[in-house]
């Protein structure tokens, strides 16, 4: 058996359909997409805006539902646009524009959009796993709204494909408390990181990995962002993360192919369950 750790190579800030092909072509098996909301808490655009990572164009933008339709095509086996390698999508939900009391509505509206335009109302929709990444612990009701909507619409089975992440670099203990409040018991990724324009140590990522490996924490997988340089990629792998978010997936793949890393890590495939803690 192959007992190497599966790695998700997460293409950062993929906000146009052309960029999906570009990043997967460079070696990503996963993408991160920014989602902006209108004043009524409807997901509106895949859009990051200024400022963004150094060396990247910040203004790529697609109507959210058009992005979902294109994403469905590239993750539906048999479609002419199908990309077999793309197995996971992180929606970086820009809920900072919303009031805290709109979080539930945002979750509801997000679920309805995904159900219709990505999952094709449960009829042979896209197959990728989805992570809802939320920047603010106070917005945990987004998860509740999302889950209750899929249940009410008769598609609870799709929750098998959905996980969550709180991306605000909060104390791990506070993240754990928030998940308790939200009634979340699994499918948890934990991110840690900072824009590539700045440096950040691995202290908190190591704390997240320790929680993951303790057997008593809530975290299943840990990813670190944004990792663009060869040495920082090696350091991140040495910390035993599960995912590396990058602007340069070809560099991540290059390091994964170095002898020292090739024996411990491999690129995740669709058969790898992203909600399962790796036991090595």
UniProtKB/Swiss-Prot annotation:
Tissue: Expressed by the venom gland.
Domain of life: Eukaryota
Co-factor remark: Binds 1 Mg(2+) ion per subunit.
GO molecular function, one term: toxin activity
Recorded GO CC terms: extracellular region
Cysteine disulfide links: 52-58, 54-197
Record GO biological process: defense response to bacterium; killing of cells of another organism; lipid catabolic process
EC category: lyase
Entry keyword set: Antibiotic, Antimicrobial, Cytolysis, Dermonecrotic toxin, Disulfide bond, Hemolysis, Lipid degradation, Lipid metabolism, Lyase, Magnesium, Metal-binding, Secreted, Toxin
EC number: 4.6.1.-
Reaction(s) catalysed (UniProt annotation): an N-(acyl)-sphingosylphosphocholine = an N-(acyl)-sphingosyl-1,3-cyclic phosphate + choline; an N-(acyl)-sphingosylphosphoethanolamine = an N-(acyl)-sphingosyl-1,3-cyclic phosphate + ethanolamine; a 1-acyl-sn-glycero-3-phosphocholine = a 1-acyl-sn-glycero-2,3-cyclic phosphate + choline; a 1-acyl-sn-glycero-3-phosphoethanolamine = a 1-acyl-sn-glycero-2,3-cyclic phosphate + ethanolamine
Localization per Swiss-Prot or TrEMBL: Secreted
Catalytic residue list: 12, 48
Cofactor(s) demanded: Mg(2+)
Family, as annotated: Belongs to the arthropod phospholipase D family. Class II subfamily.
Identification of the protein by name: Dermonecrotic toxin LgSicTox-alphaIC1
Organism: Loxosceles gaucho (Spider)
High-level lineage: Eukaryota, Metazoa, Ecdysozoa, Arthropoda, Chelicerata
